[in-house]
Amino acid sequence: MTTEKIYPIFTVRWLAVHGLAVPTVFFLGSISAMQFIQR
């Protein structure tokens, strides 16, 4: 029972972290690339 109760929470947390981290890294990367190209 404990594994079934912890598994969904861990999955949701994993998806939330990656869902927020991936766009943030892409956004910062694109901004740094724009500034690097402008210079």
From Swiss-Prot:
It is found in: Plastid, Chloroplast thylakoid membrane. GO terms for cellular component: chloroplast thylakoid membrane; photosystem II reaction center. The keyword Coiled coil does not apply. Heme binds at residue 18. Its cofactor is heme b. The keyword ATP-binding does not apply. With its partner (PsbE) binds heme. PSII binds additional chlorophylls, carotenoids and specific lipids. One of its GO terms (biological process) is photosynthetic electron transport chain. Heterodimer of an alpha subunit and a beta subunit. PSII is composed of 1 copy each of membrane proteins PsbA, PsbB, PsbC, PsbD, PsbE, PsbF, PsbH, PsbI, PsbJ, PsbK, PsbL, PsbM, PsbT, PsbX, PsbY, PsbZ, Psb30/Ycf12, at least 3 peripheral proteins of the oxygen-evolving complex and a large number of cofactors. It forms dimeric complexes. This is Cytochrome b559 subunit beta. It comes from Gnetum gnemon. The gene is psbF.
